[in-house]
């Protein structure tokens, strides 16, 4: 951080705009995925990263995933918590097993809810600035024939949709409505196959649909005509991009849209006249500011004034905070 000492007898205005690297460089968006094969098939997080990169955005993605597992498994797995603590994530995605989210409320509240809570409690403790997103998955191609209530696609999808939205409300989280974009493509473009031959996993086209839905949800913008390289039919690709745009952006309130938290940008001007100093904050994205004049006096005014009792060198300190972040900016002056 640049420092300079002011030695002016009469009147000086010092403009200091906060020389911090993140105020200039492209911000990275980091996402941790906790889930199973519906997340890692075709390395969907990597496709998301490619879409973002093609649109000039920088992403860091990582996973804590194991095939076929539910939230009970993830809540008892050490890697889940190691990954939560490993970075200040912008988003942490939670994806349960499709069958567990297709159960009645009573079963979900017993078999899933406590384990989702355990994971989210850890997120709120160790990564409080992270936005929690629930990855709403899709119904199996023909539903699950083992359970009469979800023995067809529509019944299974409806239950999955309902439970993920309920969990979003319970935990003040957002939803990535992959399952609803999936339904839109099934209904509007029946010639597009999204399913693996096993009738529940995604083929590459289905994973691209998931990635487009994540991109639209996280960045609040369309993936339409992005230049990422992906080996699917152009007409299928265009339909998926339009469907994710329509379903996500036309229903942001329904998905409990949670934009990425903005970084605090510190900055202040200093006006000096003799031993009198006037500070003016031009910082951004903060809730509270507190000043330290370097002589034992502090202030919480936005534009505080202070008279130093004696000449000398003083370190002016601006302390900014939001509900989960803090930034400090210091500037040294000399008062004659």
Language-model-detected regions and their locations in the chain:
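Short alpha-helical patches at coil-to-helix transitions and adjacent helical residues
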Residues: 41, 204-211
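Bacterial Sec-dependent N-terminal signal peptides
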Residues: 1-27
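Alpha-helical cap/lid subdomain in secreted, periplasmic
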Residues: 83-204
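Conserved catalytic region of serine esterases and O-acyltransferases that act on ester linkages
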Residues: 201, 211-271, 311
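Structured segments of extracytoplasmic/periplasmic soluble domains
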Residues: 37, 41, 47-55, 95, ...
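Extracellular/lumenal mature domains of secreted and surface-exposed proteins
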Residues: 259-336
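Conserved SGNH/GDSL esterase-like catalytic core that processes O-acyl groups on lipids
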Residues: 28-32, 38-119, 128
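Ser/Thr-glycine-rich phosphate-binding loops at phosphate-binding pockets of nucleotides
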Residues: 37, 203, 284
